[in-house]
Amino acid sequence: MARNGEGSVRPQARLLVAKGSFSVMGGGERDIIRNLPALSKKFKVTVATLDSSNELDSLCEEYGLDLMKPDVRWTPPKGPISRILDRGFSSSLESWKSIEGLVEILGDLDYLHLTSGDGSLSILEIIPARISVHLHLLEPHRGLHEDVLHRMVDGSPRRNLSLTRAALSMARRKDLSKMRRVSSRDRTAISGNSEFTSSRIEDVYGISSGVLPPSLDPEEFPSSRLEDESSSLFEIDSPYVVTIGRASWAKGTWEAISMLRGTGFSLALVGGGEDESIDSLIEHAKSCQVGLWVAPRLDSSDLCSLVKGAVAVISMAHSEPFGLTPIEAQSLGTPALFVDEGGFRETISDGVSGRLLPRDDYSAWHEALAEAGEADNRSSWSKNGRANIANMGLNPEVFSKRLEEIFLSLE
């Protein structure tokens, strides 16, 4: 297993940037799109995906990057039988093979930067052995190795968890086998997106990995951005806090509403969710007398306006791989109040650049909300957070340099 190296990649080495799906446009997808312009300065970049997004289409057109995708958009097979039999791997492989010209360009390729997710790993079946591969493993397969994704938005099991785990045993064994096969491939490096993720990769798969953190574009989240009348613009009852991520138990959405009971704060949820989950959250918010506003997705400009107008950005997510949302909040000058778990510990210093709080101590959260409203705290936490972002090198240029060094270490 190779780790970061030293040196300089030869001019315009040919890099394929690939991910199975971009349609969700979560943190992982935003990070890739954010890094593509910087990567295109170091490499001759081609992008490939089975399920593109408008944001990816627009950026590739703007920067003149070749974007390769199938004529028919791929989506993961639905249903328990498909998950048990791992049909997504075979169907995604066929979709990769169907992309016009993809197999042909592999002969001229130098490097593959592959980001994990639905449909991603199967592309390795058609990658020649001579090509250096970097797998950015954002998290082990949570649906196979944890139970948080098998719970309803309120935390209740979708079905018996023991039976679910037993039913997924074949898919789990296949996942372990695939990851160990990737780790033993020559000219291959695996990186988590945080020290926490790297430790989880070791725990779940028994393989070592490096760390390649995501990045933040200062122009996308500028500290000097003017505040808009966000509550009026988005019709949210003020004061409000923001939580980002598709509504689920894993993202802690239900718990965030429970915590806000009695505070007078509304919750703006960015990320949407299944209709059943949103309906349940609406009823839960009513019972807690918490205002709830939901947006499936916002562009960067609207998201910045929403966050700037908030008292705080909060999250009670379970074992989040990397704390990207906190640094976005810090960049915009909005306090970050997050559960003291997972990757959040790597981007928030408690009481210095935000707050890390015990999940079940709601009184501590309420005190933190009061602290977040104080001008001195908002100023100092944001200043310290931005300094930490700079110290960690969380920007597209440093990301590109780190990826370059990883590939050089494989030669």
Language-model features: locations:
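A charged, aromatic-enriched C-terminal amphipathic alpha-helix characteristic of glycosyltransferases
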Residues: 93, 360, 376-408
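Conserved acidic donor-binding segment of nucleotide-sugar-dependent glycosyltransferases
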Residues: 350-351, 355-363, 370-376
